[in-house]
Swiss-Prot record:
Heterodimer of a large and a small subunit. Antimicrobial activity is not affected by salt concentration. It comes from the Eukaryota. Keywords: Antibiotic, Antimicrobial, Fungicide. This is Antifungal protein 2 large subunit.
């Protein structure tokens, strides 16, 4: 089963890294 929370964190991490 896919975990929405995990996908949400992954997206945030990518955005954060790009922003930094």
């Amino acid at each position: 089963p896919e975990d929405p929370q995990r996908r949400y964190q992954e997206x945030q991490r990518e955005x954060r890294x790009q922003q930094e």
